[in-house]
Amino acid sequence: MAGEGINEDYPVEIHEYLSTFENSIGAVDEMLKTMMSVSRNELLQKLDPLEQAKVDLVSAYTLNSMFWVYLATQGVNPKEHPVKQELERIRVYMNRVKEITDKKKAGKLDRGAASRFVKNALWEPKPKNASKVANKGKSKN
């Protein structure tokens, strides 16, 4: 398929899909070469624990996804293979990491600052003279 004419072994209708698939495989191959050019220990030493978990999860998900594709190309239904449960398990952990990341990004309430803000924004003390004047006016009636 590397630039030759259309092969007679498969229908013409799927030629574009096969070309796209071949390009995707090439892109994945390049990404894997880049990722594997640095030792795992070197990579993980530069990252905090949360980032390490993300790298491990993405690696596991990628590997299992590639195995899913391999099974499909071999005529095995990957939905009935244990790889499906493994992918679901990895997704659960990915969601947990996402929740942790979201919690870190979420704003935190400073109760003291909030109370001062509300007090200063809403509360206005009555002038002492105004209350005496009001009382005198009521007592004269």
Swiss-Prot record:
- In this chain, the stretch annotated as Interaction with NR1D1 covers 50-100
Q: What does this protein do?
A: Plays a role in the recruitment of the RNA exosome complex to pre-rRNA to mediate the 3'-5' end processing of the 5.8S rRNA; this function may include MPHOSPH6. Can activate PRKDC not only in the presence of linear DNA but also in the presence of supercoiled DNA. Can induce apoptosis in a p53/TP53 dependent manner. May regulate the TRAX/TSN complex formation. Potentiates transcriptional repression by NR1D1 and THRB.
A molecular function (GO) held by this record is: DNA binding
One of the Pfam families matching this protein, by short name: Sas10_Utp3
Q: Subunit details for this protein?
A: Monomer and homodimer. Interacts with NR1D1, THRA, THRB, NCOR1 and NCOR2. Associates with the RNA exosome complex. Interacts with EXOSC10; the interaction probably mediates the association with the nuclear form of the RNA exosome. The homodimeric form interacts with TSNAX following gamma-radiation. Interacts with RAC3.
Q: Which UniProt keywords apply?
A: Apoptosis, Cytoplasm, DNA-binding, Isopeptide bond, Nucleus, Phosphoprotein, Repressor, RNA-binding, rRNA processing, Transcription, Transcription regulation, Ubl conjugation
Q: Which organism does this sequence originate in?
A: Bos taurus
Instruction: Briefly state the modifications made to the protein after translation.
Output: Phosphorylated by PRKDC.
Chain intervals for the UniProt region annotation (Required for transcriptional repression):
1-100
What GO biological process terms does the UniProt entry carry, in alphabetical order?
apoptotic process; maturation of 5.8S rRNA; regulation of gene expression
Coiled coil region boundaries: none
Does Transcription show up as a keyword for this record? yes
One GO cellular component term, please give it.
exosome (RNase complex)
According to the UniProt entry, the cross-link of type Glycyl lysine isopeptide (Lys-Gly) (interchain with G-Cter in SUMO2) is at 119, 126, 132
Q: Localized where?
A: Nucleus; Cytoplasm; Nucleus, Nucleolus
Q: What is this protein called?
A: Nuclear nucleic acid-binding protein C1D
